[in-house]
């Protein structure tokens, strides 16, 4: 029977930051962006309330931007890993036979 | 299988389930950000000292909070539809199995290469061996090959049932008088559990599904048919 995994940090009770790929990265950059945007706005305007609004907006935008960027790269990486896995399997299976892609390639290049 | 008190999805055993988990993460991040925004708005509402009740003529705000949710819905809908159509792709199954729901057990028919038909009953607690799983283990498992597309034809002999295996991302209703089809390709061997997912009477909770996925080479040697 699988044992329960140790409790992972869940933001607002449902976003598992530790086990969701790119979540921790996005939230951290979002927090940084929020602090930079909010504090920067305050330094220029000295308006507390508006700076908090800018901070929250910055958090949402930076988190979303990092999230999409990271997930896109993660998806690309998974596709490349799958292609590599398939090619390795094919190479092991067909090495030395007439179906070997390297043999076909070498044969055509020598011709 | 799920561990005790598990809330999240189980690890994926098929490419479709991997896509579903990815989509779930994507939707959850959007939901988190919306919840964060709403909590912030609530905090502001509860802590404001402003008492003006002039809430008319906010055209810009109304435009923003109409268009923005529409954009968010599109961001959620596009991946969702992509996966929906992916599940309907014809992937040339190499093996077909029929699954028939009864009150309260499943019948499986392997009719492609012979006429193997068997029933799958939940193991009663008194018959459990040490290490067996209560309410999940069955007397006869469904043995299938890994990395081969499999077609499941699902129906019922009496009332509505539903054939579900969460780790494969499968849930298909078993409807009397109707044949539903689902296909899957398992990516790793193992024993995977599911439970009937449509209320079907007193023992609805006691008709589990157990798949035993084995390497194709071993499956071809015919252990399934050596009963």
UniProtKB/Swiss-Prot annotation, chain B:
Residues 1-14, 88-227 are mitochondrial intermembrane. It is an enzyme of class 7 (translocase). Gene3D superfamilies: 1.10.287.90, Cupredoxins - blue copper proteins. InterPro entries: CcO_II, CcO_II-like_C, CcO_II_C, Copper_CuA, Cupredoxin, Cyt_c_oxidase_su2, Cyt_c_oxidase_su2_TM_dom, Cyt_c_oxidase_su2_TM_sf. It catalyses: 4 Fe(II)-[cytochrome c] + O2 + 8 H(+)(in) = 4 Fe(III)-[cytochrome c] + 2 H2O + 4 H(+)(out). Cu cation A2 binds at residues 196, 198, 200, 204. It is found in: Mitochondrion inner membrane. Binds a dinuclear copper A center per subunit. Cu cation A1 binds at residues 161, 196, 200, 207. Belongs to the cytochrome c oxidase subunit 2 family. PANTHER family: CYTOCHROME C OXIDASE SUBUNIT 2, CYTOCHROME C OXIDASE, SUBUNIT II. Component of the cytochrome c oxidase (complex IV, CIV), a multisubunit enzyme composed of 14 subunits. The complex is composed of a catalytic core of 3 subunits MT-CO1, MT-CO2 and MT-CO3, encoded in the mitochondrial DNA, and 11 supernumerary subunits COX4I, COX5A, COX5B, COX6A, COX6B, COX6C, COX7A, COX7B, COX7C, COX8 and NDUFA4, which are encoded in the nuclear genome. Component of the cytochrome c oxidase, the last enzyme in the mitochondrial electron transport chain which drives oxidative phosphorylation. The respiratory chain contains 3 multisubunit complexes succinate dehydrogenase (complex II, CII), ubiquinol-cytochrome c oxidoreductase (cytochrome b-c1 complex, complex III, CIII) and cytochrome c oxidase (complex IV, CIV), that cooperate to transfer electrons derived from NADH and succinate to molecular oxygen, creating an electrochemical gradient over the inner membrane that drives transmembrane transport and the ATP synthase. This is Cytochrome c oxidase subunit 2. The lineage of its organism: Eukaryota, Metazoa, Chordata, Craniata, Vertebrata.
């Amino acid at each position: 029977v699988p044992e329960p995994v140790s409790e992972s940090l869940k933001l607002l009770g449902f976003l598992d930051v530790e086990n969701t790929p790119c979540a921790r990265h996005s939230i951290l950059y979002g927090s940084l962006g929020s602090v930079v945007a909010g504090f920067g706005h305050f330094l220029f305007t000295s308006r507390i309330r508006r700076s908090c609004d800018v901070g929250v907006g910055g958090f949402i935008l930076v988190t979303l931007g990092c999230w999409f960027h990271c997930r896109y790269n993660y998806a690309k990486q998974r596709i490349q890993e799958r292609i590599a896995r398939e090619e390795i399997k094919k190479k092991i299976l067909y090495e030395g036979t007439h179906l070997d892609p390297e043999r076909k390639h070498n044969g055509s290049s020598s011709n | 299988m799920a561990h005790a008190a598990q809330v999240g999805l189980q690890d994926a055993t098929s490419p479709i389930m991997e896509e579903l988990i990815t989509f779930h993460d994507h939707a959850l991040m959007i939901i988190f950000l919306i919840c964060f925004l709403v909590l912030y708005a609530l905090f502001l509402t509860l802590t404001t000292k402003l008492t003006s009740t002039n809430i008319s003529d906010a055209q810009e705000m109304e435009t923003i909070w109409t268009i923005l949710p529409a954009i968010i819905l599109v961001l959620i809908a596009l991946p969702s539809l992509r996966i929906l159509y992916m599940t309907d792709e014809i992937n040339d199954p190499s093996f077909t199995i029929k699954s028939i729901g009864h009150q309260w057990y499943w019948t499986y028919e392997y009719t492609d290469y012979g006429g193997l038909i068997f029933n799958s009953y939940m193991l009663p607690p008194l018959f459990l061996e040490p290490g067996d799983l209560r309410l999940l283990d069955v007397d006869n498992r469904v043995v299938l090959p890994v990395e081969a597309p499999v077609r499941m034809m699902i129906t019922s002999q009496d009332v509505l049932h539903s054939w579900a295996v969460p780790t494969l991302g499968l849930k298909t209703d078993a409807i009397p008088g109707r044949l539903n089809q689902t296909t899957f390709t398992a990516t790793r061997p193992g024993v995977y559990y599911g439970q009937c997912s449509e209320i079907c009477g007193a023992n609805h909770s006691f008709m589990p599904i157990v798949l035993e996925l084995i390497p194709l080479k071993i499956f071809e040697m015919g252990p399934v048919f050596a009963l």
